[in-house]
Amino acid sequence: MRRHRGPDGAEPEKRDRWRRHELWPASAIEREEAEGVEFRLAHHRLVSGARSVKISARILHVDLDAFFVEVCRQRHPELRDVELLVVGGRRDQRGVVQSASYGARRFGIHAGMPIAQAVRLCPQATFFQGSFPHYREASQAVRAVLQRFSPVVVMASLDEAYLDFGGTDRLYPVSLLPVAESIRDAVKETTGLDCSIGIGPNRMIAKLASDSAKPRGLMEVRAGWEQGFLAGLALSAMPGVGPKTAARWAELGLTDVWQVQQMDETALARRIGADARGLKRRALGHGGTTLHAERLPKSVSRETTLSRDLRDPEELEAILFLLTARVAGQLRDEGLVGRTVTLKLRHDDFRTVTRRHTLELGTDLDGEIWQAARALFQQAFDGARARNRGVRLIGIAVTNLGVAAEADLFEPEDRRRRRELTAAVDKVREKYGFSAVTPGAILRTRRRDR
């Protein structure tokens, strides 16, 4: 384990001087054999310093462990003891892994890996196609539990959330670990899902703490001890540092956060350029401290990897239409509208093209999103046809989101009628399944392929 130093850089043997308190009697605490000021009991961790520091924020980050895998296992208990790989779209060699069980991760498999590569690493793995409605249902159940503990709950994604405990110093003067333990147990009891929880003075520290605590762990990093905690991390663990960036910096001799902490910003800029300022701030533990309870998601999107490379625009438009309908349906389910439509095409040479268009008004209607998506597709596909390139992946996203009620106040009559028709279609699909209502253009394409 990497060394955690105190706020003044003192060595670990002096750690007892830094501790403000212990959560449990000393006899109950198992000190880590490695150096540092981490104390563990049943996978609880506390990182704290001796200096009296006023806590400006107390944020919890709740991260559900192997969420997509565990939701599938709840509905299919026979998958409990197998190396399980959940795929979002295709289950053949052209698809990608959406989530891997912890057993499968031991073979080096991770989210986003092509299925063909995952099969080579773990031939005995079982593949399962996930269900977005099931994920959404489980995520909403978790959110309901979290709202019992804090009035400010921000779902960063389906499987992670931030909770604001600012101003609770008198209620919880020593530590928030007991609260985190109660949250973890309540989530497990209510939903059957495990989670890890990180606590920190800002969002970044809280998230990195939950990452360090996985699986089913708890970690608290006190204000004033951010740098000591971060010093033990690799740069690749930091937000905004992807694999390619980490590899490029490693070639320059930068692999660990403590190296960045010790460099002045000018010297760092000479090595990595314009990223120096932001990286330096993160390495010193600076991060956002505010949460907005009603923060909207950034986008709603769907994409699919095709079973074969396609060059027929009618086939591609049919697939795009279905993806658009799925996106529009999700917007309506979540009470959202969006203004910006983005098309994504990946060609058979793996070149990715995106096109976007911003509408005058936000919408959640299939037809309005489809009209923009089709125009974008025709622009992008003309270029692909000119280069004689097939398409292996197609996707659609809607961004620039807002609350649907705000857009309905001055809706024209013809648009209101389209909304009523859409609501009727939604009811049929809810009762009989999405494919119960299929446009004629899609059916014609299917008949032609027979």
Predicted feature descriptions by range:
Residues 6-9, 36, 49:
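Residue-identity detector for glycine
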Residues 361-450:
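Acidic, metal-coordinating catalytic segment for phosphate/diphosphate chemistry
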Residues 9-14, 30-33:
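Intrinsic low-complexity, disordered N-terminal segments enriched in polar/charged/small residues
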Residues 18, 38-281, 291, 329, ...:
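Gly/Gly-Pro- and Ser/Thr-rich, intrinsically disordered tail segments characteristic of DNA damage-repair
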Residues 161-167, 354-357, 403-411:
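Short, hydrophobic beta-strand segments
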Residues 4, 8, 16, 21, ...:
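Intrinsic-disorder-associated, low-complexity terminal segments enriched in Asp/Asn/His/Tyr and depleted
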Residues 54, 61, 167, 230, ...:
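DNA-contacting surface of Y-family translesion DNA polymerases
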